């Protein structure tokens, strides 16, 4: 089109007012368990839970991770009722049920021993939730800064989309064992979105 304008074949771009849909999909990088294990060794108890929920639970971080309460954990049924702040405005959404996967269970057990009687929330870090209750919302929780420091302490190189990539890695693993629609119901996304990751 630009050439046609430059060569004076046409006087103006007939499509200049037409809006196109651009792809907003960003590429996630698979985060191996060995990398998460290195981070866990350097993480404090709060950050072990954040990492575990993000990588092994597939929770959206920070919104779902910081919203999960101990009352949302059904230890006997080995399930979590995950609050979904990002999509709660959609009809029929707001909470989803997800198994407590075997990799996540010991992390939650340990966190409950430490924080269960001290904190209403699974991630016992009220400063992150307080920061999120401001104009910029969840972005203000600023978990990325602390995650970057943790990566440095562990001697691990970062990857694009730190928390999205951990969630997407969990999705990839689960899809190897379970049907796509089941995994999507657990992780709270659609098959279309899952296949873009």
Task: Indicate where each model-derived feature is located.
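Non-catalytic DNA-binding core/recognition domains of DNA-processing enzymes
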Residues: 1-4, 18, 100, 143
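Short functional hotspots where side chains directly engage DNA or cofactors
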Residues: 16-17, 54, 77-85, 162, ...
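Residues in the recognition helix of alpha-helical DNA-binding motifs
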Residues: 18, 68, 146, 150, ...
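Alpha-helix N-cap/start motif
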Residues: 61-62, 70, 180, 191
